[in-house]
């Protein structure tokens, strides 16, 4: 936003930081004129915009992002499969020992950045195949910084946030500054090992090694 405003001094772009559902809703209500999402618009949404007079409205991919899984530093288990992530979200794995026999971390607490966020939708659509999240211990806060703080202070929690939070060095709340947070490595295989599991770093997103990747649209 700052770069756009500097390059176009006669124009002004004002950013509103909100969840994906509300961003799309504001676009449909003409309260904003640009929304950045992690999904394509639906046919009904395109039709709504066309009926409002936006005949040439388009949605284009502009970037790729990954979902990062973060855990408390006290949790020694840092590799996980996509299959086990789905088991957690379906409520089939309720304790850390259901995935890692012998674990003493207790019940699994799942923390999302917002109940209406694109993170929740991705988990339902891409990990659970369109089915709802049924984990008995779900927490939804208001923003990613609160997810990080929750996981940092809760030994049995697993937080799910956008991987951009791992790389923004300007933001001191991001996990690269948190000594009590671990970033999990994720595997597509049946069993996760350090050799077949990847963290959501830019290169592993670029070469598709990291399993939990989403396209960002504008």
Segments and roles (model prediction):
Residues 1-32, 39, 57-65, 70-218:
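Exported/periplasmic ABC-transporter solute-binding proteins
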Residues 45-52, 56-61:
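Signal peptide-directed extracytoplasmic domains
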Residues 35, 41-44:
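Short helix C-cap/helix-to-loop transition motifs enriched in small/turn-promoting residues
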């Amino acid at each position: 936003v700052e770069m756009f405003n500097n390059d176009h001094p006669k124009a002004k772009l004002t950013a509103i930081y909100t969840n994906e559902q509300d961003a799309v809703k504001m676009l449909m209500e003409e309260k904003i004129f640009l929304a950045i999402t992690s999904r394509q618009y639906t046919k009904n949404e395109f039709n709504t915009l066309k009926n409002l007079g936006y005949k040439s409205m388009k949605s284009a991919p502009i970037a790729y992002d990954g979902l990062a899984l973060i855990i408390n530093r006290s949790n020694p288990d840092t590799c996980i499969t996509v299959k086990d992530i789905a088991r957690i979200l379906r409520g089939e794995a309720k304790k850390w020992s259901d995935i890692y026999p012998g674990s003493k971390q207790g019940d699994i607490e799942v923390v999302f950045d917002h109940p209406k966020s694109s993170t929740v939708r991705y988990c339902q659509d891409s990990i659970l195949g369109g089915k709802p999240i049924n984990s008995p211990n779900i927490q939804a806060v208001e923003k990613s910084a609160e997810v990080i703080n929750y996981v940092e202070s809760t030994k049995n929690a697993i937080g799910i946030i956008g991987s951009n939070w791992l790389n923004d060095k300007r933001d001191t709340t991001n996990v690269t500054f948190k000594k009590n947070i671990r970033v999990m490595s994720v595997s597509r295989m049946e069993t996760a090992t350090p050799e077949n599991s990847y963290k959501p770093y830019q290169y592993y997103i670029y070469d598709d090694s990291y399993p939990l990747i989403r396209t960002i649209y504008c």
